[in-house]
Amino acid sequence: MKAAVYDVEGAPGVLQYVDVPDPVAGPDDVLISVEAISIEGGDLINRRSTPPPFPSWIVGYAAAGTVVAVGSKVCSRKVGDRVTAFSMQGSHAERWAVPAERT
């Protein structure tokens, strides 16, 4: 899948649009097919001034889309639900695994 990532902090030019492995929903997660993202102030501040904790760090705190898979412990969401979500990273990608409680 494609995602917006960075390997070093800096100006917008450090962002890359690359192929990364598909995320997998854990037992408490939903997997979202991302249809819209939100660019938050923290996205900009962190990209500019904070080294990413891992290579190919997928940026983004917020997105909306459709649930395409649910973890084994999730009862509050089902495949096909349209959701918004907020978590600490990973929303700027084609798919995003996020705790169901954050949707």
Show which residues each predicted segment covers.
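Short N-terminal binding/cap micro-motifs at the start of the first secondary-structure element
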Residues: 10-15, 41-42, 75
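Short beta-strand or tight-loop elements
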Residues: 13-18, 63
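Glycine-rich beta-strand-centered segment in the early N-terminal region that forms part
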Residues: 21-38, 49-90
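Cytochrome P450 core scaffold surrounding the K-helix E-X-X-R motif
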Residues: 42-48
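Glycine/small-residue-rich loop that forms an oxyanion/phosphate-binding "nest" at active or ligand-binding sites
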Residues: 84, 102-103
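A structural motif shared across PLP-dependent enzymes of the aminotransferase-like
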Residues: 87-100
